[in-house]
């Protein structure tokens, strides 16, 4: 009887210990939650950005609640974030800037003039050397976009209109990578 009681007590203790779940994608561990300001965001999904069959970065989308509709994510004025970890030495600052510029062109249908100043600020965040293992957190909170590199905030600017174009790079009709889009939407 003592063994049964002790077993039940230990079992109850083991299951009451909090666990910090994580998700691994392409060798990169993404936490299942992320704190942005006062908000706790949950990992919606993640995937790998590929180009010419090479893995470039692992990306994860964090939202206040899970969502699979890409248009709702783009239009939403709620806190959200994209986490990226560079997994290839092929990504340089110049290549990242080119990809971002191309992404904004596609996301806005070529009409970048209303947000051009914010695009330039965003691009400036990628001017420093980029190397394998670098992390970027692009978050939207309290009406502004914030960019952090390796855990250090670089800049904060923009508004909802800019955020919509920015998230359109990953979730628009012509995303940077369709498989990454589906992964971050939780479909893969």
Predicted regions and their residues:
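Positively charged n-region of N-terminal signal peptides that target proteins for export
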Residues: 1-4
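Bacterial N-terminal signal peptides
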Residues: 7-16
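Terminal leader/tail segments of proteins
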Residues: 20-188
């Amino acid at each position: 009887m003592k063994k049964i009681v002790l077993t039940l007590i230990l079992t109850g203790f083991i299951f009451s210990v909090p666990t910090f779940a994580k998700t691994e994608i392409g060798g990169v561990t993404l936490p299942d939650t992320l704190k942005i300001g006062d908000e706790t965001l949950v990992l919606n999904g993640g995937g790998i950005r590929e180009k010419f069959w090479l893995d470039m970065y692992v990306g994860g989308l964090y939202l206040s609640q899970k969502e699979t509709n890409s248009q709702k994510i783009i239009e939403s004025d709620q806190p959200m974030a994209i986490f990226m970890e560079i997994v290839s030495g092929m990504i340089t600052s110049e290549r990242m800037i080119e990809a971002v510029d191309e992404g904004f062109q596609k996301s806005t249908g070529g009409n970048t003039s209303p947000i051009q100043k914010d695009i330039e600020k965003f691009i400036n965040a990628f001017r420093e050397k980029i190397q394998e293992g670098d992390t970027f957190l692009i978050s939207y909170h309290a009406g502004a976009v914030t960019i952090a590199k390796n855990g250090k905030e670089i800049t904060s600017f923009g508004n909802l209109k800019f955020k919509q174009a920015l998230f359109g790079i990953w979730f628009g009709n012509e995303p940077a990578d369709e498989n990454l889009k589906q992964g971050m939407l939780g479909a893969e």
